[in-house]
């Protein structure tokens, strides 16, 4: 299943005064992302502040993105949690909305399942889901790492179509790519590892930086696929300071700051996250301005 090369892990626009998910701002952001290099969108993922969105807010968000998208980009809904039964129920509900192409299921966090538990969790969700499942391995947040052997086993299940790999372990990612079928999609979950993962056979990136430099991310990937490796490497090096700067404080505060500065109004982050202070904002803006020099 081809979900695209550059998939943006979309921030969730919040009205700054009402502290509510904002329909008008969602519409503006989705159009901006599609026009600027996004093949697909992940909605209500980590970057979308899913832990601080209510169930009803997520449904509202999904409905508005589906309506605005109108079939242009691939849409992936974040429906995972650390409760298997709730994940299944929510995934089934989202499938009834129509317009979603897949779901992103995060590794269960806090309760620390072992590898057998992780396999059983994803297998149960995949069996129950009417939508294709993308695994989300992010041990820095979930505490547990989905080992390559577990992902390779899961990749054999017919409804599991890919993985967003945010472990940062290139050896493990290489093993997954080598031992899964060609139609199993392996995406970098870290912007800075996009090019290295492409080099070992990956399919693309689920990106944060593409909010700001989506066309440049596309250019890097396309250059690599044309065999212009040096050009791709040059673009990678040019974008690297911004990729790192977007995680200088907890995500997605830096991305929301830059979007707001550029006139793409997405509002603040929600507590317990906090927005950038003046010094942090100035440093980040300087990094962005340095890209054009």
From Swiss-Prot:
Signal sequence interval, chain numbering: none
Alphabetized UniProt keyword annotations: Amino-acid biosynthesis, Cytoplasm, Diaminopimelate biosynthesis, Lyase, Lysine biosynthesis, Schiff base
Annotated EC: 4.3.3.7
Record has Lipid biosynthesis as a keyword: no
Site (Part of a proton relay during catalysis): 46, 110
Pfam assignment, any one: DHDPS
GO biological process entries: diaminopimelate biosynthetic process; lysine biosynthetic process via diaminopimelate
Amino-acid biosynthesis as UniProt keyword: yes
EC class name: lyase
Residues at the catalytic site: 136, 164
GO annotations of cellular component type: cytosol
Physiological role: Catalyzes the condensation of (S)-aspartate-beta-semialdehyde [(S)-ASA] and pyruvate to 4-hydroxy-tetrahydrodipicolinate (HTPA).
PANTHER family: 4-HYDROXY-2-OXOGLUTARATE ALDOLASE, MITOCHONDRIAL (PTHR12128:SF66), DIHYDRODIPICOLINATE SYNTHASE (PTHR12128)
Protein name as it appears in the record: 4-hydroxy-tetrahydrodipicolinate synthase
Source species: Listeria monocytogenes serovar 1/2a (strain ATCC BAA-679 / EGD-e)
Source taxonomy: Bacteria, Bacillati, Bacillota, Bacilli, Bacillales
This protein's encoding gene: dapA
């Amino acid at each position: 299943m081809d979900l695209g090369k550059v998939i943006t892990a979309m921030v969730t626009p919040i009205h700054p005064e009402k502290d509510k998910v904002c329909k008008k701002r969602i519409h503006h952001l989705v159009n901006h992302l599609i026009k600027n290099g996004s093949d697909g969108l992940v909605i209500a993922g980590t970057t979308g502040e899913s832990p601080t969105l209510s169930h009803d807010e997520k449904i509202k968000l999904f409905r508005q993105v589906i309506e605005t998208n109108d079939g242009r980009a691939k849409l992936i809904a974040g429906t995972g949690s650390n409760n298997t039964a709730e994940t299944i129920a929510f995934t089934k509900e989202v499938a009834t909305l129509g317009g979603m192409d897949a779901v992103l299921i995060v590794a269960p966090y806090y309760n620390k399942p072992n590898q057998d538990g992780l396999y059983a969790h994803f297998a149960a969700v995949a069996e129950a889901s009417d939508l294709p499942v993308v695994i989300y391995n992010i041990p820095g947040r979930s505490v547990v790492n989905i080992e390559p052997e577990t992902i390779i086993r899961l990749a054999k299940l017919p409804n599991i179509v890919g993985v967003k790999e945010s472990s940062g372990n290139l050896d493990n990612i290489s093993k997954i790519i080598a031992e899964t079928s060609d139609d199993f999609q392996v995406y970098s979950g870290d912007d800075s590892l996009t090019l290295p993962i492409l080099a070992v056979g990956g399919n693309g990136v689920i990106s944060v930086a593409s909010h700001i430099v989506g066309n440049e991310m596309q250019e890097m990937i396309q250059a690599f696929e044309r065999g212009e490796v040096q050009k791709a490497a040059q673009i990678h090096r040019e974008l690297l300071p911004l990729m790192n700067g977007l995680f200088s404080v907890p995500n997605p505060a830096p991305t929301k700051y830059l979007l707001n500065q550029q006139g793409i109004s997405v509002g603040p982050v929600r507590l317990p996250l906090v927005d950038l202070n003046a010094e942090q904002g100035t440093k980040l803006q300087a990094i962005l301005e340095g890209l054009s020099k």
